[in-house]
Structure formats: C-alpha cells, structure tokens
Amino acid sequence: MDDRLTIFIISDSLGVTARTIAKACIQQFPNHDNWQFERYSNINNKELLDKVLEKAKDKNVCLMFSLVDDDLARYAQERSEEEHFVYVDLLSNVIKAMSKLSGVEPLGQPGLLRKLDKHYFKRVEAIEFAVKYDDGKDPRGILKADLILLGISRTSKTPLSMYLADKHLKVVNIPIVPEVPLPKELNEVSPKKIVGLTNSVERLSQVRKERLRSLGVSGTASYANKDRIYEEAAYAEEVMRKLKCPIINVSDKAIEETATIILEMIKENQL
C-alpha cells in the first residue's frame, strides 16, 4: 500500500468546493505537506464511482464525497463501509437538514452553483465592453453603448463604468480635455444616453495631487493646478450644455450613490 496520505475528492460536478474544504482542513495538521489530492469530477453514476473506489484500495486514503444525488451518495457510503475506507459525505446531512427545515425536497441536480445563465453572460459582456471602451479608447463604442459618461479627469468615470457594467449596462466613458476634440459620435446619440460628471475644483485638485504622488510626480504639476482645473471644468460645462445632457456633481458622493442616481435617470427615460 502507498503510505502517502491521499484525499480523494469525488464529485458529481467539478469538486471545487470539496477541494477548498479539504485544503482548509489539512492546514490544521503540521505535516500537511505530506497530503496529496486526487480529484474526480462528474462522477454521476455507480459505474464511474466503482472505478474510483477501485483506485482507492491500494492507498492510504480519505474519501470526500460531494454528491447531490441522494441515491448515489447513499451508494458511496455503503461501498465505503464495505471497503473500510475513511470517508466524509460533505453534502448529504446539510441538504437533509435544509430540506427538513424548509419542507421542500432538494432538486438533486449537480453543478447548479456554476450554471451560467443569460444574466451571467450579459454581465460579463457589459464588463468586457466597459474595459474595451474605457477612457475614450475607441469612439465607435459610443454608438453601441447603453450609456455614455463624460467628464474631466478624476470625476469617477471608470469606476462608475465598471459598477454600472455589473448591473448589465454597456457603458462608454469619454474624457473631456480642452485641447482634444470630442468624438463626432457624441452628436449622433440621444442626450438621454449621455451623463456629464463634475466635481468641485478643491476636491479635484486634492485627488489629482494624490494621483501624481502615487506616480512619483510632483504635486505642483499643471494637472493638479487649480487654474488649470477651473479651465477644464468651464470647458466641460460648456460641452455638456451644448449636448443638453444631465449633469451630476460627484463631489462627496460614493460610487454607489452616483450610480443609483444614473439608474433612476435611465428608468425615468425608459432607456
């Protein structure tokens, strides 16, 4: 028999949860480096289970079952008793307790935690969209977006884009810089799809100085200069006025608070 200590992870899904539990448990033992794992995924019938148990016969093994099918879990326990294996059924007792408490029979379907539904894909698509079109990288995204955020530097455009992407919205954010022409595509979308973001000059100066320091640059650079920020803010206000888009001052607002305001706007405009 192989003297090494082995944990067999046996699951009718991927077995990720069971492996995480097992790894957490072995940390309690000083010799945990001597343990090894073997994971057997998608073990969803007795024939497959028997093949795994056959492999366990010649090893110093602990079996960890993560089986939601009640019949298969019961069979695994019976076979383990017959072969005198050390084993743990991770799910059966928990599922039975929940069923007893709720009065509802469990579905017995493996992999439900990891099933990818349309909402998941929509969220991922929105996040990828936000990354692709962040900071005006590609103005073509404006015509594809659910929402366009405009603002000068450090007005929370990127974190807002990502937060709203988590709500399944495809968001483009465009920086406003006096010396840089705005994308012509902005004139081709409804003002209701555009939101302008502003901030107080004092707050912008403070945030920009902190940003420069984090980059190892002097806080006296023009980027953080109040006169420069006044110039940018005035230009941005003029742009937003011409576009006739709503404007939100993000000063002293959490990302979640600003996002809630935007979501309410979208709801009102039925976009």
UniProtKB/Swiss-Prot annotation:
It catalyses: N(tele)-phospho-L-histidyl/L-threonyl-[pyruvate, phosphate dikinase] + ADP = N(tele)-phospho-L-histidyl/O-phospho-L-threonyl-[pyruvate, phosphate dikinase] + AMP + H(+); N(tele)-phospho-L-histidyl/O-phospho-L-threonyl-[pyruvate, phosphate dikinase] + phosphate + H(+) = N(tele)-phospho-L-histidyl/L-threonyl-[pyruvate, phosphate dikinase] + diphosphate. GO terms for molecular function: ADP binding; ATP binding; phosphotransferase activity, phosphate group as acceptor; protein serine/threonine kinase activity. ADP binds at residues 151-158. It holds the Pfam family Kinase-PPPase. It comes from the Bacteria. InterPro entries: Kinase-pyrophosphorylase (IPR005177), PPDK_reg (IPR026565). The keyword Nucleotide-binding applies. Belongs to the pyruvate, phosphate/water dikinase regulatory protein family. PDRP subfamily. Bifunctional serine/threonine kinase and phosphorylase involved in the regulation of the pyruvate, phosphate dikinase (PPDK) by catalyzing its phosphorylation/dephosphorylation. This is Putative pyruvate, phosphate dikinase regulatory protein.
